[in-house]
Each structure stands twice: as C-alpha cells, then as structure tokens.
Amino acid sequence: MDIKEQLSAAIRQAAQKAIADGVFPAGELADILLEVPPDKKFGDFATNFAMQSARVFRMNPKKIAEELVSRIEGDWLDHAEIAGPGFINFYLKGNVLYDLLRHLYEGGEACFNLPQKDTARIMVEYVSANPTGLLHVGHGRGAAVGSALVNLLRAAGYPVHSEYYINDAGNQIDNLAASVNARYLELLGKETVFPENGYHGADIVDTAKRIVEVDGEKYLSLSEEQRLAAFKEFALKEKLAQLKEDLAAFNVTFDEWFSERTLHPEAVRDACQTLKEKGKVYDKDGALWLRSTDYGDDKDRVVIRDNGVPTYLAADIAYHRNKLERGFGHLINIWGADHHGYVCRVKAALAALGYAPEQLEVLLLQMVSLYRGGELVKMSKRTGESVTLEELIEEVGTDAARYFFLMRSLDSQLDFDLDLAKSHSNENPVYYIQYAHARISSIFRQAADAGIETGGTPEFSRLIDETEIALIKKIEEYAEEIERAARERAPHRIARFAYDTAGLFHSFYNKCRIVGVEPALSGARLALVAVARNVLRHALGILGISAPEKM
C-alpha cells in the first residue's frame, strides 16, 4: 500500500470512528481525493473530503475537518492542518517519502508488477476485423487500446487471455471469394459481372494478380463453384497473413486466433437447441427468434433465418458461450461505437442461456479523425480509400501512432494530428516521454565516463529541492495508478501518467545538477532518476511503446 492509499484509508477510518462516536450520522462516504499542493507550505498532500461530505453529514465542512483531524492516525503522519473552508493539509514525517523511494529503488522495475489476483480469468477480445480487407485507422485504435489493456491488466495482477475472433464464415467470405474471382477473370481478359456486394479495394486486385502470377489460367478450366472455393481459401489465407503482419508491426499479438468456422454447425446448433429447451426462442414466419425483449432489448432477434441459415447473432451466441465454457469468468469485448445497439442482444442471449449478463463487459471505441495541416484527411492519397493502419505506421511510426491512439479515453472521439505525431519536439507527447527516458540513460553514461560508481546505499535524505520531492511523490503513485487504470479499463491514464512523470523529470533536470556535484548528493539523484527511468520504461511497456536509450 503506497502513501496515498495509507492516507485515504486513514481518512476513511477517521470518518468511520466519528460515525461510531455519534459525531457524524451514518451515511455513504464520499470519494476521497488527494492532491499534491502547488506549494510545499500547504503540506505534502491535501484533500477536500470534508467539503465533499458536508451534504452527507449535514455539518459545516470546517467542523467535519476538525473531527477528522482529531481522529486520523498514522506513524507516517507528522501533523495535519485545516485550511480555508475545510481543506485538510497533511504533512508527512521526513523519512516516509525516502523510505518508499528506497523500496522502489531496491526492488527495481519488478516493483510495478502487482501481486497476482485470485479472480476469474479474463478474456479480452479485440480488433476481430473481417479478413476481407486491410486494417484502417479505426481498427488501429482498437488494436492499441486492446493490447495496452491486456498489458495493463497483467501488470495489475489479473489472469488475462487475449483473442482475435476470425470472421471466416458467412456471406462476407463468400463475397471476398466472388470479388477475387471477378478480378481474376478481368485480368485474364474474360467478361464478368462484379458482385453487387463485392469488395472494391485495390488489395483485392493485388490478390487476383498473385493468383495469376502463381497459377496463370489454371482456374479457368474449373467450374465457378470450384474456382470460388479455391479463391476463398487463397484469399482468406493471404488476408490473415496480412492482418497478422500489420498487427505485429504495431506491437500487437494475441494468445489465440479463434476461427468462426469451428462453431459451424455443431456449436451454433447446440446453442440454439439449449435456447429451445429453456423456452427462450420461438418460431415465427419460418424463422427462429430469440426472446431478447425479455432481457431489455427493444425487439426480439432472429437467430435462424427462414432459409435455415444462422444469423451473425447465432454465431456470436455460440462464440460467447464457448468463451465461458473454456473457463473464462469475465469477458471484455472492445467494439466500435457503431456496435452499441448490438450489446444488449448479446447480453440478452447470455442471460437466456443462464449466464450472468454482467460477465460480458463491452467497451465501445469512438471514431478517429486524422488531420494534416489543420485539414481533415478523409481518404488515402495512395488508394483513394480509408487510410490504412499500414499507411499510418509508415507516416508517423508505431510508437507515435500507439501513443496518440491511447492518450484519450476510449469513449472520447479522437482527433489525430499527423503533423504533431511526426514532430521531434516537446509538443509531441510521445517524443517528450521518450526523450526523458533517453536523457536519463545519457546521464548514466555521463556518470560512467566521469568514473562515478552507482549502487550502494543512496542518502535519499539529501533530496530536498521542491522538484526532487515532486518527482518522488509522483513515482510513488505509479503502482496505485496501475491498479486504478486497470480497474477503470483506462490505459489512457498510464499515457497521461508517463507524460506527467516526464514533465516532472525535465523540471528536476533543468534545475538540479546530477553529475558534478558532491558524491552523496550525486548518488542520491542518480538513484532517484534510476527509479524514474524504471517508471517510464514500465509505463511505455504497458502502452506497447519503445523506451529508447538514445535519441
């Protein structure tokens, strides 16, 4: 438990004591928010908890603060003072921050991987784009958020499994094969009609060209049915390989790639049969309908069409049942915001099968808009279509793309400034963070060149400058931030924490010399920046971003 957690717990216990003493009426306690005051004369931490509690306790905030201060206990606390209308300023004993810093220094980066939690296994499914075309920037945001969330949950001690659901069954794959077939025939000078629901991307033409390069006119002698079957497998294999290559270049990997085909027909049929046995579906107009309105949906949903073909929902019901049957107790899906209407029907299906709907948690991603020179970028200059993830990586790099995707909460629309992402300046947040890491590494090279030995037992009590104290306090909050960000499914909090930590380091560096001062002070400052570097490297690792030694 870090110092802020200890302080929050002490405030909560003081409030509960006051309730037990009959001073405060019973009621739900307000959230306890602790901040570092801008001026050290106002203490090490401050809270407005007394003012937030005035309505609950029906008392003057200053009186609440007085009762709390008289009951707060902690051997790390020197004293507390009441300021203004009811702020409480806390002054820690001199050794507390230094003891915590020593713990982080001696424990190294491993300190920030929290103990394993005894909780249900979590599956995070994300991206899961149809293997019918290239990944676009919207998929890129989902890939960045999903992979960072998996890293974050693991750092917080949760048992996590990541998965990509391959939509390799159904009409979209038939349309893929038909599109490749049409382009193949066109390339060989044959008359053909392009399918009505076909895919027009340049990548489809490229796939057809590769078939011609490898096998020439071989497929002309086959029936259309045979040709479509062959092209379906060729195109699917190629598209999957491209997906995996693009995602790997974006520092995204999955524990499993799950094929929808494995659900057909048995798993889909079994799920529908279970729903029938439970009385959760009914026949109407030749189709099979899920009673999803019983679970809050705005209308019942078809699971088997009147032609006997399962809907996408039927496959999704079977897939989510499969996830739970594999032993995952909590499912996290990351979908685009345009899927918001689909959430209720999947939860309804799980409830109809007898599962708790809250076992499925759906995170909805908002849109990404690209800007260049202050103008909205609507289409790719290369293809005239949506900008692909591959093109984005080529233009700004993986690190910048990932950070910009992650620096806003996933439920916020993202305006992506391409010019800023490419700039090598402090205005570019990822450059600013990486430069802090590289600068610290440079400090250690300078120390080595100067013959300064690192290690030993640093005299942390020598760190008294306000920029040193501010940096110490920040890095000591990191473990708590990991816990909170994981709990809130908010990797953007780690992006912000890394940025703020880098800022405090730069302020410290600009004011305090590290190499070239007396040895005890130099050793303490070297140890401090070593811990700061560990924090930055660990945070960047969660975000899937490199931590360069030189820039």
Predicted feature locations:
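Non-catalytic interaction-recognition regions
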Residues: 1-98, 105, 109-551
